[in-house]
Amino acid sequence: EMEVWRGQQEGLKVIIVNPGVILGPGFPSQGSGTLFSTIKKGLSYHTLGTTAFIAIPDVITTMYRLMKSDCCNERFTLIAENLVFKDVFFTIADALKVKRPTRYASPLLTTIAWKIDALLAFLSIKKRTFSRVTAKASHSAIPYSNQKIVSQLEPTFTNIKAYIQEIAPTF
């Protein structure tokens, strides 16, 4: 991002887009697709933290509209909704027709989990999948705002729970 702003200082017109967690079909072993594949395999635990989500068609449409607009040299946060992880996990589980993750993972439990994950990765037993940052974020409840993009373009964002139902069959 710093390089983009440097380019702006050189005279380029730039728009920075910071999306929330982007949900889209396919790619079960990458990005947000790992949420679907992990829950499908049988995730037992959930947390009560929140984060921002957006559907990939909304990202594409909004970026296209920004490129066609007169707007330049600004940064936008693209989110449709701030949702609790527990609710998202339950929605994904229901859409995949698998058991919901019913046990609450406390901050202590997620701390232990990331340390075990780090140890197993250090010993080359498995690839790193759960970091300290992920553990901390899973309990964070700081909402993100999309007011700037809403006031500029007045976009209509897809309902995330409905979109999860739509894309779940691709996993």
Language-model region placement:
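Mid/C-terminal beta-alpha module of Rossmann-like enzyme folds, strongest
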Residues: T62-T129, N146, S151, F157-F171
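Active-site Tyr-X1-5-Lys
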Residues: E1-I16
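Short aromatic/basic micro-patch
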Residues: I16, F53, N82, P143-Y144
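Alpha-helical membrane-targeting segments
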Residues: G31-F53, K99-S140
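Substrate-positioning beta->alpha
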Residues: Q30-G31, T47-M67, E74
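Proline-centered turn/helix-capping motifs that create local helix->coil transitions or kinks
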Residues: L12, P25-S29, S124
